[in-house]
Amino acid sequence: MASSPILILGGTSLVATYLAARLKGTGRTIQLVARRTTSPIAGLPFVPWSELAAGVVPATPGAAVISLLPLPVLISLLPRLTGVRSIAALGSTSVFSKATSDEASERATAGKLAAAERALEDWCGTHGVGMTLLRPTLVYDLVSDRNVARLARFARRFGFVPLAKPAKGLRQPIHADDVAKALLAAVDTPAAFGKRLNIAGGAPLTYRAMVERIFAGLGRKPRLVLLPTAILRVGFSAGSRLGLVREAAFGSSVFSRMNEDLTFDVRDGLELLGYDPRPFDPAGPLRLGDLDAQTVAALT
């Protein structure tokens, strides 16, 4: 089973680079699918998305599929995956955290995720495909993610980070490499088939503590501006209209959630997959202030 060919859907995803690094030297046949005309990861066999979607290049029979695609996109591709052995797909804990958001667009996103989860489970059950759905929490890699790296860019640019006081909502950031570990375990663990598992990083920490560690990773003293949520909403709405805070992409719901505990029960995933996630430490061996795309390339 562990020698099954691997088909990675979503080759430009944040996690893809780490998957490729972990698969090197394993002897497994690897095929990458992405919306590119050339492979986004040098040295890996590559199939353009358009060719797989059109059926020009069929999925390898018996392959273990790892999907990094948004779930609704994966659902549209399922007819082209008939004959594969298993699918390990990434969902999101946003299916829970955004279900009661004060923004209609976020509630709609949660609804689409929930519908896609059901569709994936139904299709895999009908076609005899082993399915494992992994819902990661806040995913980061200290380089190009939309969470930690984006906050770090804001801190670099402005020298401070605004927080909705007291910013005590708990978070469980998970590194992209730990997500890759969990996915690789999932495709080869029959006991995980049919499961929807939440996965997260090490010990939870408050939103405020997370931002303080980001400053430490930049080698800077934390400068936090703690304000009421209502004031931050108005200020960032105005800043967005003026084009001053596009990088941060803060919406009103982001500030509201800074004081919500977005933690999830991950015991089943840890027990079944054994991915042993690292603690959140941007000031650790891979220092946030020193990392760039070339560093990631060197790691792989």
Q: What label would you give each PLM region?
A:
Residues 32-37:
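N-terminal Rossmann-fold cofactor-binding loop
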Residues 38-84, 89, 93-103:
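NAD(P)H-binding glycine-rich loop region in Rossmannoid oxidoreductase-like domains
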Residues 107-133, 142-145, 149:
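Active-site Tyr-X1-5-Lys
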Residues 145-150, 165-187, 194-198:
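Substrate-positioning beta->alpha
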Residues 185, 189-249, 266, 271-300:
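Mid/C-terminal beta-alpha module of Rossmann-like enzyme folds, strongest
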Residues 95, 139, 179:
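Conserved sequence/active-site signature of Rossmann-fold short-chain dehydrogenase/reductase
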Residues 5-26:
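N-terminal Rossmann NAD(P)H-binding glycine-rich loop of SDR-like oxidoreductase domains
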Residues 138-170, 214:
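NAD(P)-dependent short-chain dehydrogenase/reductase
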